[in-house]
A protein has these predicted regions:
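Preference for solvent-exposed, low-hydrophobicity sequence contexts
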Residues: 1-192
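Extracellular/virion structural assembly segments
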Residues: 2-6, 180-346
Length: 346
């Protein structure tokens, strides 16, 4: 796998080998830095080249080669596509006349997101040159790449290009592969709120996306009642025992409302809740890995109104030492031009 031998085994007779967990070790994943100024970013680590070499008892040999991707689709859709004689790659990812991006935000020809949810969209470069047309001015931007390679479209850099060249804050784009229309991308203004948080998560297709939260957050420190944490210690002065304990670990949990979300965003939220890799930003200076859940969450089969959902984000790490955030300038008196300063001139 990736020119390296990972697994070697043998067996007798007819047998099956599930190689999914073995192959997954060769897919490292990659975090894309959205502050890059390139329009598209080359992405690696999200797939692996796999070769299986088989030799039977009769010394007959055969090779099977394929590209493995981390992620998948629902069992229901997998069965349906199999009965149709197709797969998600032929139907979507390698189809230049449709929404070919690795996003679960949308299941049609349009992708809508808020400004606070902008994050590079991953895709396999189509057979023809990619072109992005801004609908207000009609101006186009050509984004060259190599067909079949994996890239991420940097929407922030694309918007900056149109703003710099044409003086327009672009919010609506049409994406073409050559002369073939593929999809439309719309960017909405985020509501003005007192508190805002973001969740970056690994979606079902194996790429990262961002979900914006516009509700007020509250923190609940969770303490484990461990009987072994309390013990008896001997006091030489009184010749008696007294109770003592080791430092107690506390696991924080943040409760927050999502803000009102449309039906399509609620489906997107379901993918977030099932993700195995979720990070919270906006709570501190750095992202924090969390485990999301939703209590008493239900939605209508045919929804006709936005919905506000309460999420519980449990921190992945437990802490027994509480020192606050440590910053380089946090222990010095702030100057006039610091991010935080008093009205008194210093």
């Amino acid at each position: 796998m990736n020119n390296e031998e990972i697994f070697k085994g043998n067996g007798i007779g007819e047998f099956r080998v599930n190689i999914a967990e073995i192959v997954e070790t060769g897919i490292t994943g990659a975090r894309i830095l959205p502050d890059n100024t390139d329009h598209i970013l080359a992405v690696s680590g999200l797939s692996a080249e796999v070769t299986i070499h088989v030799v039977n008892e009769g010394e007959e040999e055969d090779n099977l080669s394929f590209t493995a991707w981390k992620g998948g689709i629902s069992k229901k859709e997998f069965k349906r596509l199999r009965n149709m004689g197709t797969d998600i790659f032929s139907l979507k990812f390698l189809n230049e006349s449709c929404n070919f991006f690795f996003t679960t935000r949308s299941n049609d020809w349009r992708i809508m997101m808020r400004e606070t949810e902008l994050y590079p969209l991953c895709f396999i470069y189509p057979g023809h040159e990619l072109k992005i047309t801004e609908l207000l001015t009609g101006q186009s931007l050509t984004v060259p790449g190599t067909a079949g390679n994996f890239y991420a479209l940097n929407l922030e850099a694309v918007r900056l290009k149109f703003f710099t060249d044409y003086g327009v804050l672009a919010n609506l784009f049409d994406v073409y592969s050559g002369d073939t229309f593929a999809l439309r991308i719309g960017i909405e203004q985020s509501p003005t709120v007192r508190e805002r948080y973001r969740l970056r998560f690994l979606n079902s297709y194996g790429t990262y996306e961002v979900f914006s939260l516009e509700g007020e957050a509250s923190v609940t420190p969770g303490m484990d009642e461990d009987e072994d944490a309390v013990f008896r210690r001997y006091d030489e002065i009184t010749d008696d025992y007294y109770s003592d304990r080791i430092r107690t670990e506390i696991q924080e949990a943040v409760t927050i409302k999502t803000g009102f979300k449309r039906p399509q965003e609620i489906r997107f939220l379901l993918d977030l809740l099932s993700s195995d890799d979720v990070y919270l930003s906006g709570y501190g200076r750095e992202e924090i890995k969390v485990i999301p859940s939703a209590e008493e969450f239900s939605y209508r089969v045919r929804p006709d109104a936005p919905q506000n959902v309460t999420l519980k984000l449990t921190f992945a790490d437990k802490e027994s030492n509480w020192t606050g955030e440590i910053t380089e300038s946090g222990y010095r008196k702030p100057k006039v031009h610091s991010k935080e300063f008093s009205k008194q001139f210093n």
